[in-house]
């Protein structure tokens, strides 16, 4: 049986999907808009369970999840968030049944083909993070083409984590630095936190401010471990295909109402704000 993934016509992007066409939500107070995170990361969990509740195959949940991705990108773009990172396929997901993995790879290829024009139109810069060497040559070629097409865009940076793991990211950065030390390009004393950060997948972006996880679980699943050292965490029971702009805005409002201390006391933060 063919593993080709077909989209229903309603799932395809249209002119009405242009992100700039929807105004900012009135539900967000001005204070929240002033406290927006620069970098939001989302663990998109619950596709399979959503499909099961609908009496459908798991792949239908992944297909429905594509629409939620579009809504999240739209909401982030409208709010002026700098970076949005989506956990699409972890390095541990290869352990899933071969048929599901094959369908996910085909879905990834199809989505890259069909969404890239909409992303480019809305000035979204696509960045695939992770070890893509394990993907087929066909998929790797499509990834490079999509990244190249949007490379010059100045809007939202959309990082899609594919065959990604937080530990892998730290390890590959450390290995690059170790090689530089070995070849004499740098000394061991220059092996610093800053140097390591510069060799991670998202080296030119701000650290993650907010992690949103859908699906009702309370863990970060080896996702952006280094970059999320001081991130606020918001866990939602909502299954990913049901995630919409309202859920995104509510998570942003939750973030804005928290006091981020970075090791300081609450009193110190209040004093700094009063200056």
Curated annotation (Swiss-Prot):
Pfam families: Prenyltransf. It catalyses: 8 isopentenyl diphosphate + (2E,6E)-farnesyl diphosphate = di-trans,octa-cis-undecaprenyl diphosphate + 8 diphosphate. Its EC number is 2.5.1.31. Its cofactor is Mg(2+). GO terms for biological process: cell wall organization; peptidoglycan biosynthetic process; polyprenol biosynthetic process; regulation of cell shape. Keywords: Cell shape, Cell wall biogenesis/degradation, Magnesium, Metal-binding, Peptidoglycan synthesis, Transferase. The active site is at residues 45, 93. GO terms for molecular function: ditrans,polycis-undecaprenyl-diphosphate synthase [(2E,6E)-farnesyl-diphosphate specific] activity; magnesium ion binding. Disulfide bonds: none annotated. Belongs to the UPP synthase family. Catalyzes the sequential condensation of isopentenyl diphosphate (IPP) with (2E,6E)-farnesyl diphosphate (E,E-FPP) to yield (2Z,6Z,10Z,14Z,18Z,22Z,26Z,30Z,34E,38E)-undecaprenyl diphosphate (di-trans,octa-cis-UPP). UPP is the precursor of glycosyl carrier lipid in the biosynthesis of bacterial cell wall polysaccharide components such as peptidoglycan and lipopolysaccharide. This is Ditrans,polycis-undecaprenyl-diphosphate synthase ((2E,6E)-farnesyl-diphosphate specific).
């Amino acid at each position: 049986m063919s593993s080709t993934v077909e989209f229903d016509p309603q799932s395809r992007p249209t002119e009405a999907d242009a992100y700039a066409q929807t105004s900012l939500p009135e539900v967000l107070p001005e204070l929240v808009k002033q406290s927006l995170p620069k970098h939001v990361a989302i663990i998109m969990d619950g596709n399979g369970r959503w499909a099961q509740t609908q009496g459908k195959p798991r792949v239908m949940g992944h297909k429905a999840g594509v629409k939620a991705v579009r809504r999240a990108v739209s909401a982030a773009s409208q709010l002026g968030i700098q970076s949005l990172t989506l956990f699409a396929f972890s390095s541990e997901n290869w352990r899933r049944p071969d048929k599901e993995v094959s369908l996910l790879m085909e879905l990834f290829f199809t989505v890259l083909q069909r969404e890239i024009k909409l992303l480019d139109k809305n000035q979204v810069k696509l960045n695939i993070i992770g070890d893509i060497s394990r993907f087929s040559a066909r998929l790797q070629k499509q990834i490079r083409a999509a990244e190249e097409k949007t490379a010059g865009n100045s809007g939202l940076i959309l990082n899609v984590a594919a065959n990604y793991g937080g530990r892998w990211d730290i390890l590959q950065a450390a290995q690059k630095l170790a090689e530089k030390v070995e070849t004499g390009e740098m000394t061991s004393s220059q092996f610093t936190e800053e140097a390591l950060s510069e060799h991670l997948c998202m080296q030119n972006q701000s650290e993650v401010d907010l992690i949103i996880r859908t699906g009702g679980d309370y863990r970060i699943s080896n996702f952006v471990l280094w970059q999320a050292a001081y991130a606020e965490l918001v866990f939602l029971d909502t299954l990913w295909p049901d995630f919409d702009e309202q859920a995104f805005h509510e998570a942003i409002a939750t973030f804005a109402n928290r006091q981020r201390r970075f090791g300081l006391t609450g009193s110190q933060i209040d004093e700094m704000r009063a200056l």
